[in-house]
Structures are given as structure tokens and as C-alpha cells.
Amino acid sequence: MAIVKCKPTSAGRRHVVKVVNADLHKGKPYAPLLEKNSKNGGRNNNGRITVRHIGGGHKQHYRLVDFKRTKDGIPAKVERLEYDPNRSANIALVLYADGERRYIIAPKGLQAGDVIQSGPDAPIKAGNAMPMRNIPVGSTIHNVELTPGKGAQLARSAGAYAQLVARDGAYVTLRLRSGEMRKVLSEGRATIGEVGNAEHMLRELGKAGAARWRGVRPTVRGVVMNPVDHPHGGGEGRTSGGRHPVSPWGVPTKGYKTRSNKRTDKYIVRRRNK
């Protein structure tokens, strides 16, 4: 994997930094594992914007990624690594010994030709998935299930990982990248290793158009809006907003705690680092 800084042959190329991975498959994705992925422009069923800065972008198919890893005891050979436009991590197409193909999140170090496995008896090796009760304390893991059987929800993006730091009865304690220490059920599954493509964070799109290709619309500052649109709007000439920074709905944006899920507080051993 290489980091390529483009020559400034034009204004649009001047600031571009690319992540080039020669190992990625250059052909089309595996068709049986594709689904239609319709765009909604950030609107809900009433047509109202519920998520800002979304709209346009290139058409994409959704890749059906296996986040459950429930084919126990059947070895799978990695056929190829692929780009996935729906996530920051790359994905791997694996062929199981019984003939079935599935996509999985590609962990760091995984290459075409490697053999992976899932299940309680799988060896401790990058790419293998198993219940967390079978994973040694101190191991680095990703694709962590919060609810056994539901599928992975934690540590799925490029370069992400968690560390299993303790085991206590029916629970294990994880240290997440944010610094949060959290208990999860030990019956839930996780995959050994960390997610690959960690260099994703080093890329620079270089121009607004590259963000538009990805379906990202512009962000407008509140101080340049009208009073009807934002608490910072209005005023004659340039203003500072006249108050501490808030969202368009008046919620403070600088360090204000918004976590309200009291139901899961008992599972958080230590809050994330500030």
C-alpha cells in the first residue's frame, strides 16, 4: 500500500493525496452478493431532511458483508481483496470449502490465498472469528458483537480495533479506540486482528468535487445564514454569532454531553477520553 501525493498540474490536483493498494481486485464485484442501494438525499419518508450534507454522488451497489461469521468449522480461502464504496475498510471475497462465497471485512495483513476459519475451535490468527470467551486476554480484535448473534457492531471501520483486557463471568471488558472501557457478553463473536486499510485517514480529496462524487454536500456556517435558519444567523455585516456555538437546533456544540442512553450505562466501565 502506497501514499501518493499528486503533482500540482491543476488546482484540483494540487492537494490530492491518494492511498494506492495494488493488491485490490481491478474487475467487477461478485454479482450474487450485490444489492440495490437507493439514495434518499438524507430525507425521511416525509421528505424532510433528517441528515444534513447528503445528496448526489455516484451510483453504488451494496455489498452483502458477513458480519455474523457463523459458518463454524469450515475453512475458507481468501480469493481476493476488493474496494467497497460503502465503507472505509476494504473487503475480502472468501470461498468456503462447501462452495459458498461470502464477503468479510478485510483485516490487516490478510492476503489472497490465506485460509481463515470461524468457530470456538478456530486458531488465534488474524481473520479468524470466534466467541470472545475463547479469545485470550490482551488480544487485539475487531468486528465485535454487542448482542450475540446480531452481527458485529463495534470496530468495523478502516484501522479500527479493540483490546480484550479482562474476563469476568458472562462478560468480557474491552478497551475501545476512544479510550472507553466497556463490558460485552462473552458469547458474542469477534474477529482476531485489526481492520486493514488504516492509511485511509491519510487521504486528501483535494477538491470539493471529489466530496460530491461521494455524495457529500457542502456545509454552510451558521453565521452566514438568516435568523430563521440558525441561532447564529442575522446581524448587520459580519458577526461572531453573539453566543456560544450551537447547532441549528440550539444544542451546544463544544464539549456538551448529549449521551442519554441510561439503559447501557451499567456496561461502561470508563467513559471515553476527552
Curated annotation (Swiss-Prot):
Any Gene Ontology biological process: cytoplasmic translation
Disulfide bonds: none
GO molecular function: RNA binding; rRNA binding; structural constituent of ribosome; transferase activity
Record has 4Fe-4S as a keyword: no
Region annotation Disordered: where it falls in the sequence: 223-274
Domain of life: Bacteria
UniProt keyword list: Ribonucleoprotein, Ribosomal protein, RNA-binding, rRNA-binding
PROSITE patterns registered for this protein in UniProt: RIBOSOMAL_L2 (PS00467)
Pfam families (UniProt xref): Ribosomal_L2, Ribosomal_L2_C
SMART domains: Ribosomal_L2 (SM01383), Ribosomal_L2_C (SM01382)
InterPro entries for the chain: NA-bd_OB-fold, Rib_uL2_dom2, Ribosomal_uL2, Ribosomal_uL2_bac/org-type, Ribosomal_uL2_C, Ribosomal_uL2_CS, Ribosomal_uL2_dom3, Ribosomal_uL2_RNA-bd_dom
One GO cellular component, as annotated: cytosolic large ribosomal subunit
Function statement: One of the primary rRNA binding proteins. Required for association of the 30S and 50S subunits to form the 70S ribosome, for tRNA binding and peptide bond formation. It has been suggested to have peptidyltransferase activity; this is somewhat controversial. Makes several contacts with the 16S rRNA in the 70S ribosome.
Subunit structure: Part of the 50S ribosomal subunit. Forms a bridge to the 30S subunit in the 70S ribosome.
NCBIfam families (UniProt xref): rplB_bact
Protein family membership: Belongs to the universal ribosomal protein uL2 family.
PANTHER family: LARGE RIBOSOMAL SUBUNIT PROTEIN UL2M, RIBOSOMAL PROTEIN L2
Protein name: Large ribosomal subunit protein uL2
Organism per entry: Vibrio cholerae serotype O1 (strain ATCC 39315 / El Tor Inaba N16961)
